[in-house]
Amino acid sequence: MDEKRLTHLRQLEAESIHIIREVAAEFSNPVMMYSIGKDSSVMLHLARKAFYPGSLPFPLLHVDTGWKFREMYEFRDRTAKAYGCELLVHRNPQGEALGINPFVHGSAKHTDIMKTEGLKQALDKYGFDAAFGGARRDEEKSRAKERIYSFRDRFHRWDPKNQRPELWHNYNGQINKGESIRVFPLSNWTELDIWQYIYLENIDIVPLYLAAPRPVLERDGMLLMVDDDRIDLQPGEVIEQRMVRFRTLGCWPLTGAVASEAQTLPEIIEEMLVSTTSERQGRVIDRDQAGSMELKKRQGYF
């Protein structure tokens, strides 16, 4: 294939499909992490293209905290059924028994127990030796320095000083028993690339990405959408209907919306063309402390 004849989106598509096929051929038990967001939707679309007309040679895994938006759960189940994918859902049973939640225990503890520990439990339970993730280098500085094949030790830890060279399109997937690789096929994509590709390929996404009147309250400089009756209202807080959408999706008490009138994909793309902030500004977990994402990744987070 002559890459010079491809548009930049088709070049990114070809690179991602190549990576996905390499992992499927090289590893004995891969899995695709499915967080239900826009990047997961693009990654799943690319995987289906990579093996069309066959089915995916690996399952999808959703590490569930119990605090995702209701529309995300509906979209997850509908998508898995429509595409005939094997969907594995894991919740940390110890965290559930302790009633861990973001309101009482805070974002750092909630994320560590329900997401990081939950992820490690699931990877160990099923014995996965490679796990696809939808992270991109433009999202956040610790992800910017991570390889496409991200080596993890037997405790699932990431050491940024112990990474393997990736020359051209050659990836080193050699691991010992108990070790694993996190694979990021979308590493070289930007947020704008993602939206342009979603528009180009008509990929289905969670409606929360499109602007609509939603019940929100202001807290710590963020707009939190009230998704169910578990909200812990603080003195002076008022729930009001505002026109908002989400640039990133996670646990609803930890994910901020943005004021927006973008109700269509072209309107979202127009917003991205003039945006000067990262989509991660809407994630409370990224504000826990300086370098919080890198610390979480060192402990086993995606």
Swiss-Prot record:
Keywords: ATP-binding, Nucleotide-binding, Nucleotidyltransferase, Transferase. SUPFAM superfamilies: Adenine nucleotide alpha hydrolases-like. Gene3D superfamilies: HUPs. It comes from the Bacteria. InterPro entries: PAPS_reduct_dom, Rossmann-like_a/b/a_fold, SO4_adenylTrfase_ssu, Sulfate_adenylyltrnsfr_sub2. Transmembrane segments: none annotated. Pathway: Sulfur metabolism; hydrogen sulfide biosynthesis; sulfite from sulfate: step 1/3. Pfam families: PAPS_reduct. GO terms for biological process: hydrogen sulfide biosynthetic process; sulfate assimilation. It catalyses: sulfate + ATP + H(+) = adenosine 5'-phosphosulfate + diphosphate. Its EC number is 2.7.7.4. One of its GO terms (molecular function) is ATP binding. The keyword ATP-binding applies. HAMAP family: Sulf_adenylyltr_sub2 (MF_00064). With CysN forms the ATP sulfurylase (ATPS) that catalyzes the adenylation of sulfate producing adenosine 5'-phosphosulfate (APS) and diphosphate, the first enzymatic step in sulfur assimilation pathway. APS synthesis involves the formation of a high-energy phosphoric-sulfuric acid anhydride bond driven by GTP hydrolysis by CysN coupled to ATP hydrolysis by CysD. Heterodimer composed of CysD, the smaller subunit, and CysN. Belongs to the PAPS reductase family. CysD subfamily. This is Sulfate adenylyltransferase subunit 2. The lineage of its organism: Bacteria, Pseudomonadati, Pseudomonadota, Gammaproteobacteria, Enterobacterales.
